[in-house]
From Swiss-Prot:
It comes from Bartonella tribocorum (strain CIP 105476 / IBS 506). NCBIfam families: S21p (TIGR00030). InterPro entries: Ribosomal_bS21 (IPR001911), Ribosomal_bS21_CS (IPR018278), Ribosomal_bS21_sf (IPR038380). It comes from the Bacteria. GO terms for biological process: translation. Belongs to the bacterial ribosomal protein bS21 family. This is Small ribosomal subunit protein bS21. The lineage of its organism: Bacteria, Pseudomonadati, Pseudomonadota, Alphaproteobacteria, Hyphomicrobiales. One of its GO terms (molecular function) is structural constituent of ribosome. The keyword Ribosomal protein applies.
Length: 77
């Protein structure tokens, strides 16, 4: 991964690098690899993540089509 340092502005380059790493999922990958995960646990985690993703997508789709409110309550006097 490469980030250009312009005008000796290291702070800006560091922020750009952290943003790139966050977007690529490197921090999450490092956290996951910091300990051993049994293959069965990995499959279970990935399955749970997939279920969570599909539910979230279905919820967003239903909200967009107007079947479900967006979860906010409106106070009526």
């Amino acid at each position: 991964m490469q980030v250009l340092v312009r005008d000796n502005n290291v702070d800006q380059a560091l922020r750009a690098l952290k943003k790139k790493m966050q977007r690529e999922g490197i921090f999450r990958e490092m956290k996951m690899r910091s300990y051993y995960e049994k293959p069965s646990e990995r499959r279970a985690r990935e399955k749970a993540e997939a279920i969570r993703r599909t539910r979230k997508l279905a919820r967003k789709r239903a909200q967009r089509e107007g079947f479900v409110s967006n979860g906010r309550t409106i106070a009526v006097k």
